[in-house]
């Protein structure tokens, strides 16, 4: 783990400007509304979470995989690489970077196939069409895009420090931790430093648990306007999420999503440089 966030590639290269992020997204917003794009974000975060849990990965590994996924599509259209392939690729890479240990090829493909069939069959009625050669090639493109900047800082550690400083660990930590997990369904991890996200989640937890922490927050040397911006995004997430029926909506949204060329049959697959350019698009 790099010692200082302010000197890290996370801060120097991967805290993005919101307007630049929206500009990069315009290609996809020709096919999807902003609300549909947001629902895709929630959905694929759920896929990564379910896959990570199936593989018994730590939450930090799952969070890192989610950040990798978001970084890729912050720079490229959904059409460039199928998100159904990118999701397990991000899990595969994150498990190595976070020193959890390499998930074996067979186990990764079996887990992805099982999770999509049992948890997300309403969205993916067909078998998972990719094999390990696709994952490895996708990993190459992901590494290239991130320029091998693989260390990701998360809000979990600062959150622990803050609740301990408050002396409210038992009351606030479980709820604030869950709120941090939920923020990965938004763009917040691309836009704000993790310590600010931690403070915003803690603030929301204090309000929900009716803990008066105004004095504690007032003593912080932090831009509270930015904390309030993050809180507004969190509240908007919960407001929209409660009206989102994944089972009814996702098949239609996925059908509208811009896609690369169709995947090949499992026999005689070829990568993006072969005659069957399955999961990648150069456009």
UniProtKB/Swiss-Prot annotation:
<dbReference type="GO" id="GO:0045944">
    <property type="term" value="P:positive regulation of transcription by RNA polymerase II"/>
</dbReference>
<dbReference type="GO" id="GO:0042802">
    <property type="term" value="F:identical protein binding"/>
</dbReference>
<dbReference type="InterPro" id="IPR043198">
    <property type="entry name" value="Cyclin/Ssn8"/>
</dbReference>
<comment type="subunit">
    <text>Component of the Mediator complex, which is composed of MED1, MED4, MED6, MED7, MED8, MED9, MED10, MED11, MED12, MED13, MED13L, MED14, MED15, MED16, MED17, MED18, MED19, MED20, MED21, MED22, MED23, MED24, MED25, MED26, MED27, MED29, MED30, MED31, CCNC, CDK8 and CDC2L6/CDK11. The MED12, MED13, CCNC and CDK8 subunits form a distinct module termed the CDK8 module. Mediator containing the CDK8 module is less active than Mediator lacking this module in supporting transcriptional activation.</text>
</comment>
<feature type="modified residue" description="Phosphoserine">
    <location>
        <position position="275"/>
    </location>
</feature>
<dbReference type="GO" id="GO:0000307">
    <property type="term" value="C:cyclin-dependent protein kinase holoenzyme complex"/>
</dbReference>
<dbReference type="InterPro" id="IPR006671">
    <property type="entry name" value="Cyclin_N"/>
</dbReference>
<keyword id="KW-0597">Phosphoprotein</keyword>
<keyword id="KW-0805">Transcription regulation</keyword>
<dbReference type="GO" id="GO:0045746">
    <property type="term" value="P:negative regulation of Notch signaling pathway"/>
</dbReference>
<dbReference type="GO" id="GO:0005654">
    <property type="term" value="C:nucleoplasm"/>
</dbReference>
<dbReference type="GO" id="GO:1990508">
    <property type="term" value="C:CKM complex"/>
</dbReference>
<feature type="compositionally biased region" description="Polar residues">
    <location>
        <begin position="272"/>
        <end position="283"/>
    </location>
</feature>
<keyword id="KW-0195">Cyclin</keyword>
<dbReference type="InterPro" id="IPR036915">
    <property type="entry name" value="Cyclin-like_sf"/>
</dbReference>
<keyword id="KW-0678">Repressor</keyword>
<comment type="similarity">
    <text>Belongs to the cyclin family. Cyclin C subfamily.</text>
</comment>
<dbReference type="InterPro" id="IPR031658">
    <property type="entry name" value="Cyclin_C_2"/>
</dbReference>
<comment type="function">
    <text>Component of the Mediator complex, a coactivator involved in regulated gene transcription of nearly all RNA polymerase II-dependent genes. Mediator functions as a bridge to convey information from gene-specific regulatory proteins to the basal RNA polymerase II transcription machinery. Mediator is recruited to promoters by direct interactions with regulatory proteins and serves as a scaffold for the assembly of a functional preinitiation complex with RNA polymerase II and the general transcription factors.</text>
</comment>
<protein>
    <recommendedName>
        <fullName>Cyclin-C</fullName>
    </recommendedName>
</protein>
<dbReference type="GO" id="GO:0045023">
    <property type="term" value="P:G0 to G1 transition"/>
</dbReference>
<dbReference type="InterPro" id="IPR013763">
    <property type="entry name" value="Cyclin-like_dom"/>
</dbReference>
<dbReference type="Pfam" id="PF00134">
    <property type="entry name" value="Cyclin_N"/>
</dbReference>
<feature type="domain" description="Cyclin N-terminal">
    <location>
        <begin position="20"/>
        <end position="151"/>
    </location>
</feature>
<dbReference type="GO" id="GO:0016538">
    <property type="term" value="F:cyclin-dependent protein serine/threonine kinase regulator activity"/>
</dbReference>
<dbReference type="Pfam" id="PF16899">
    <property type="entry name" value="Cyclin_C_2"/>
</dbReference>
<dbReference type="GO" id="GO:0016592">
    <property type="term" value="C:mediator complex"/>
</dbReference>
<keyword id="KW-0010">Activator</keyword>
<feature type="region of interest" description="Disordered">
    <location>
        <begin position="252"/>
        <end position="283"/>
    </location>
</feature>
<keyword id="KW-0804">Transcription</keyword>
<keyword id="KW-0539">Nucleus</keyword>
């Amino acid at each position: 783990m790099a010692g200082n966030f302010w000197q890290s590639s996370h801060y120097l290269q991967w805290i993005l400007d919101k307007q630049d992020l929206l500009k990069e997204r315009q290609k996809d917003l020709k096919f999807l509304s902003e609300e549909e794009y947001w629902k895709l974000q929630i959905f694929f975060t759920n896929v990564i979470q379910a896959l990570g849990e199936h593989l018994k990965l730590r939450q930090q590994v799952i969070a890192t995989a989610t950040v990798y996924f978001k970084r890729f599509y912050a720079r490229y259209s959904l059409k460039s690489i199928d998100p159904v392939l990118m999701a397990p690729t991000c899990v595969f890479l994150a498990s190595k970077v976070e020193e959890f240990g390499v998930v074996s090829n067979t186990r990764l493909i079996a887990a992805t196939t099982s999770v999509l069939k049992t948890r997300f069959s309403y969205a993916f009625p067909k078998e998972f069409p990719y094999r390990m050669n696709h994952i490895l090639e996708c990993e190459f493109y992901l590494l290239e895009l991130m320029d091998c900047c693989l260390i990701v800082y998360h809000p979990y550690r600062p959150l622990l420090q803050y609740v301990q400083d408050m002396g409210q660990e038992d009351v606030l930590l479980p709820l604030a931790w869950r709120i941090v997990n939920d923020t990965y369904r938004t763009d917040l991890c691309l836009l704000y430093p993790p310590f600010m996200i931690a403070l915003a989640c803690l603030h929301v937890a204090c309000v929900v648990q009716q803990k008066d922490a105004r004095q504690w927050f007032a003593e912080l040397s932090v831009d509270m306007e930015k904390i309030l911006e993050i809180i507004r995004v969190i509240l908007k997430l919960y407001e929209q999420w409660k009206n989102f029926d994944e089972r009814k909506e996702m098949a239609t949204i996925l059908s509208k999503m811009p896609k690369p060329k169709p995947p090949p049959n499992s026999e005689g697959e070829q990568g993006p440089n072969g005659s069957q350019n399955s999961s990648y698009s150069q456009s």
